[in-house]
């Protein structure tokens, strides 16, 4: 993993390190002078190496596609579900925020909490007058630098009809004629 220059004493990394695999190393470095064998002196020092994480991992959703059902007529703010992604980077490189990535996000009657990933309804949705299915692209973005890494999942929300409308008689006037003796 490491090498040391015998001339300068400079410590070098021999191959790339990955903070997700191992983030700390403890080395013992020993210097020996060039005196005759019986007169040589040496000194040792313990060197601790902390590997600083870089933003080298994308967030990963537990599921990349999911379909759920949501009852019509639920009030605004009703919880739909929570999406969850993980990022194996550490610190801000692994801290995630969520958003709806659809271009028409303003028209979608759902919102996602940027911190928790909880999806909620923005308004009451009516099966008879609104769309019956919504396709959301949910994005998880890390807070990494120099650039953010992201991943998306597709969430399909199908609206379920509930029994909220009375039956209606289509013909209000009905004339019945009976001849005597038929009843």
Positions of PLM-derived features:
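Extracellular cadherin-type adhesion modules in metazoan precursor proteins
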Residues: 1-183
């Amino acid at each position: 993993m490491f090498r040391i220059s015998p001339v300068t004493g400079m410590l070098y990394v021999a191959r790339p390190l990955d903070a997700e695999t191992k983030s700390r190393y403890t080395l013992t470095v020993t210097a020996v002078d060039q005196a005759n064998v019986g007169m040589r002196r040496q000194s040792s020092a313990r060197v601790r190496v902390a590997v600083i994480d870089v933003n080298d991992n994308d967030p990963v959703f537990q599921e990349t596609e999911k379909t759920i059902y949501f009852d019509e007529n639920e009030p605004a703010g009703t919880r739909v579900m929570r999406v969850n992604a993980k990022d194996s980077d550490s610190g801000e490189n692994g801290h995630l925020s969520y958003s709806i990535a659809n271009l028409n996000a303003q028209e979608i009657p759902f919102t996602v909490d940027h911190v928790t990933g909880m999806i909620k309804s923005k308004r009451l949705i009516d099966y008879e007058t609104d769309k019956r299915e919504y396709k959301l692209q949910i994005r998880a973005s890390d807070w990494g630098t120099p650039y953010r890494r992201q991943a998306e999942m597709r969430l399909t929300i199908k609206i379920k009809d509930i029994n909220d409308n009375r039956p209606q008689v289509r013909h209000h006037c009905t004339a019945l004629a009976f001849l005597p003796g038929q009843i």
